[in-house]
């Protein structure tokens, strides 16, 4: 990422600290953010997974009984701004957030900020060789078809693919 670089990257990473709280996030990197790291693009996951990313109300007793070190991630906003890449607006989502089309649709509320590309980052290793790996790819394909937008999908297991606006 030199100062004149035309390279961009989205990286899935937990961000935050003990005092403020942690978020399951996507960080957007570019030459501009290298020069001013405080201006780094950040998407914080909105639709958190029960027990994996937050403890549902009324179930703290279960975590205490199991003596498991589980904590809560902080939820991000529903209508997060996109990551600007040249003349494109990339809308990240994390893991199974692409299952919730009505939540993704909220990102189209402002036509000036509406995504032109969707990007999904997922840690699917905990599924093993289960059907969920293939199901998640099919969900991403349907979202591309639904919104008529391409999707960039990066996973540590499963399918890392580029899906066109027709879901192919």
Residue spans for each PLM region:
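Enzyme catalytic cores with a strong preference for nitrogen-chemistry domains
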Residues: 1-168
């Amino acid at each position: 990422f030199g100062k004149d670089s035309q390279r961009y990257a989205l990286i899935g990473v937990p961000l935050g600290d003990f005092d403020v709280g942690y978020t399951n996030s996507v960080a957007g990197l570019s030459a501009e953010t290298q020069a001013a790291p405080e201006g780094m693009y950040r998407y914080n996951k909105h639709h958190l997974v029960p027990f994996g990313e937050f403890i549902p109300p009324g179930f703290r007793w279960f975590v205490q009984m199991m003596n498991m070190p589980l904590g809560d991630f902080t939820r991000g906003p529903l209508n997060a701004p996109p990551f600007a890449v040249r003349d494109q607006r990339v809308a990240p989502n994390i893991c199974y957030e692409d299952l919730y089309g009505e939540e993704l649709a909220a990102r189209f509320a402002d036509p000036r900020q509406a995504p032109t590309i969707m990007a999904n980052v997922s840690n699917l290793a905990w599924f093993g060789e289960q059907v969920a790996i293939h199901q998640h790819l099919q969900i991403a394909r349907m979202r591309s078809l639904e919104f008529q937008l391409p999707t960039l999908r990066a996973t540590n297991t499963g399918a890392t693919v580029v899906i066109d606006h027709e879901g192919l």
